[in-house]
């Protein structure tokens, strides 16, 4: 067996997949901002902007833009990347997440002398710094999520001694994740780097084969990634959608053959979700 075939990738969404709700709620609570008002405004942004001549709107970018408006207007006073990182410690994970990730870490230690390895990846439209500041960060190989700049480079920075702004609050978006990025990540993991995505890489030279890539997420924004594995790459058993409470959407995705399986967002040993993940590991390493 090719040694690359002994490496498996577990790709997780974050909000409502690993944690209760959206990570931004921690931020809203910390700064006493009404989350319902914020998200209601976000839902209306596209319509209002289009009414005023802004015709090309990215749904993911527009929420980040409105978030930065709140920062700029002082509702998230002095918010920078360090503050986001520190708030990550307050994120509340679903039952069993930390235990599962710790168990996977122990499995990897036992595999050190072999060519097998389990890698955990996070792909989220949430905030990367909060994920990096959370309890699971030590277990994760790489995080794709939205990233902000706080200290920005000044005009003519090449000629200046003080190249960065003195204002260190979040000021602009330098990376964002939408459903198209989520599908791209699958190929990036498969080929081993972003630079190789558009290159023709022989299967024998790819980092992780598609059959060893497993995708766990909660919602409709992940459907394109599900369908890449399910329909195009013919690995329907490699995808699973999770739910917390109401399983209506999860069942809908499953019965429409848009995802391979579904389970309650409980990662405790013995649950369906735990067993699904451990089965994939045992069959692949």
UniProtKB/Swiss-Prot annotation:
SUPFAM superfamilies: HAD-like (SSF56784)
Domain of life: Bacteria
Record-given protein name: Uncharacterized protein BB_0007
């Amino acid at each position: 067996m090719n040694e690359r075939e002994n490496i498996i990738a577990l790709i997780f969404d974050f909000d409502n997949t690993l944690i209760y709700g959206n990570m931004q709620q921690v931020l809203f609570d910390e700064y006493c901002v009404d989350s319902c008002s914020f998200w209601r405004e976000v839902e209306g942004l596209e319509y209002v902007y289009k009414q005023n001549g802004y015709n090309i709107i990215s749904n993911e970018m527009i929420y980040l833009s409105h978030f930065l408006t709140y920062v700029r207007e002082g509702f998230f006073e002095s918010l920078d990347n360090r503050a986001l990182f520190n708030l990550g410690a307050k994120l509340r994970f679903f039952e069993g997440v930390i235990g599962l990730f710790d168990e996977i870490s122990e499995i990897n230690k036992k595999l050190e002398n072999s060519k097998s390895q389990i890698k955990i990846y996070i792909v989220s439209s949430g905030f990367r710094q909060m994920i990096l500041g959370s309890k699971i960060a030590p277990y994760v190989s790489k995080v794709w999520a939205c990233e902000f700049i706080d200290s920005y480079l000044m005009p003519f920075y090449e000629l200046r001694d003080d190249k960065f702004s003195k204002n260190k609050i979040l000021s602009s978006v330098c990376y964002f994740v939408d459903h198209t990025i989520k599908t791209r990540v699958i190929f990036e993991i498969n080929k081993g780097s972003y630079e190789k995505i558009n290159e023709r890489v022989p299967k024998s030279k790819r980092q992780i084969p598609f059959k060893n890539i497993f995708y766990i997420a909660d919602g409709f924004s992940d459907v394109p990634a599900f369908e890449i594995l399910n329909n195009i790459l013919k690995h329907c058993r490699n995808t699973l959608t999770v739910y917390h409470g109401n399983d209506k959407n999860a069942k809908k995705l499953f019965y429409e053959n848009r995802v391979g399986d579904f389970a309650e967002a409980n990662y405790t040993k013995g649950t369906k979700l735990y067993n699904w993940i451990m089965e994939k590991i045992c069959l692949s390493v």
